[in-house]
Amino acid sequence: MSGTLILVRHGQSEWNLKNLFTGWRDPGLSELGHEEATSAGRKIKDRGLRPDIAFTSVLSRAKVTNTHILEVLGLPALETIEDVALNERDYGDLSGLNKDDARKKWGEEQVHIWRRSYDIPPPGGESLRDTGARVWPYYLREILPQVLRGKTVLVSAHGNSLRSLAMVLDGLSGEEIVKMEIATGVPIVYRLNPDSTVASKEILEG
């Protein structure tokens, strides 16, 4: 057995609450989001997991989630690396729009295609494939080597950046990954083999 990878989608943001496309915009966590992030920390602690290093995007909702988790674990000064590579998918022209308003403007079917297709981006934005093209190389270069040294690594990021990791770790197709839901504030724990394959996966829902 090698190391452990803990993936956490940030707690609910103010814009999740308002049903807005967020992408690279930078709203804070909602009241529930702060609670979800703290709860994620408790779930990790209850499993006896103790991160050796943390990674997060440069967006505040992920950074604050990471901070809450580390505070619960008694590790407020843990080394944390922030990188734009872990940012949420860029929704381009949809960013900041209410999802219902976007459906009125472009049509329900078109918005559904942009949201749930693997390789069709919204205007000025990224597809899930585009997101994976920056997330996965970063994982291979920066995160995986830490795990293969036997470390426990915490990654606090976003629905689509984490989907991009789960797609490869779980061996999912583009069609399958767009249907995968990643809940806010629910840790996903992967234990990796020395050859970087997945030995086990556990979702800490309880």
From Swiss-Prot:
<keyword id="KW-0312">Gluconeogenesis</keyword>
<comment type="similarity">
    <text>Belongs to the phosphoglycerate mutase family. BPG-dependent PGAM subfamily.</text>
</comment>
<feature type="binding site">
    <location>
        <position position="61"/>
    </location>
    <ligand>
        <name>substrate</name>
    </ligand>
</feature>
<dbReference type="Pfam" id="PF00300">
    <property type="entry name" value="His_Phos_1"/>
</dbReference>
<dbReference type="InterPro" id="IPR001345">
    <property type="entry name" value="PG/BPGM_mutase_AS"/>
</dbReference>
<comment type="function">
    <text>Catalyzes the interconversion of 2-phosphoglycerate and 3-phosphoglycerate.</text>
</comment>
<feature type="binding site">
    <location>
        <begin position="159"/>
        <end position="160"/>
    </location>
    <ligand>
        <name>substrate</name>
    </ligand>
</feature>
<keyword id="KW-0324">Glycolysis</keyword>
<dbReference type="InterPro" id="IPR013078">
    <property type="entry name" value="His_Pase_superF_clade-1"/>
</dbReference>
<feature type="binding site">
    <location>
        <begin position="9"/>
        <end position="16"/>
    </location>
    <ligand>
        <name>substrate</name>
    </ligand>
</feature>
<keyword id="KW-0413">Isomerase</keyword>
<comment type="pathway">
    <text>Carbohydrate degradation; glycolysis; pyruvate from D-glyceraldehyde 3-phosphate: step 3/5.</text>
</comment>
<feature type="binding site">
    <location>
        <begin position="22"/>
        <end position="23"/>
    </location>
    <ligand>
        <name>substrate</name>
    </ligand>
</feature>
<protein>
    <recommendedName>
        <fullName>2,3-bisphosphoglycerate-dependent phosphoglycerate mutase</fullName>
        <ecNumber>5.4.2.11</ecNumber>
    </recommendedName>
</protein>
<feature type="binding site">
    <location>
        <position position="99"/>
    </location>
    <ligand>
        <name>substrate</name>
    </ligand>
</feature>
<feature type="binding site">
    <location>
        <begin position="88"/>
        <end position="91"/>
    </location>
    <ligand>
        <name>substrate</name>
    </ligand>
</feature>
<feature type="active site" description="Proton donor/acceptor">
    <location>
        <position position="88"/>
    </location>
</feature>
<feature type="site" description="Transition state stabilizer">
    <location>
        <position position="158"/>
    </location>
</feature>
<comment type="subunit">
    <text>Homodimer.</text>
</comment>
<dbReference type="GO" id="GO:0006094">
    <property type="term" value="P:gluconeogenesis"/>
</dbReference>
<dbReference type="GO" id="GO:0004619">
    <property type="term" value="F:phosphoglycerate mutase activity"/>
</dbReference>
<feature type="binding site">
    <location>
        <begin position="115"/>
        <end position="116"/>
    </location>
    <ligand>
        <name>substrate</name>
    </ligand>
</feature>
<dbReference type="GO" id="GO:0006096">
    <property type="term" value="P:glycolytic process"/>
</dbReference>
<dbReference type="InterPro" id="IPR005952">
    <property type="entry name" value="Phosphogly_mut1"/>
</dbReference>
<dbReference type="InterPro" id="IPR029033">
    <property type="entry name" value="His_PPase_superfam"/>
</dbReference>
<feature type="active site" description="Tele-phosphohistidine intermediate">
    <location>
        <position position="10"/>
    </location>
</feature>
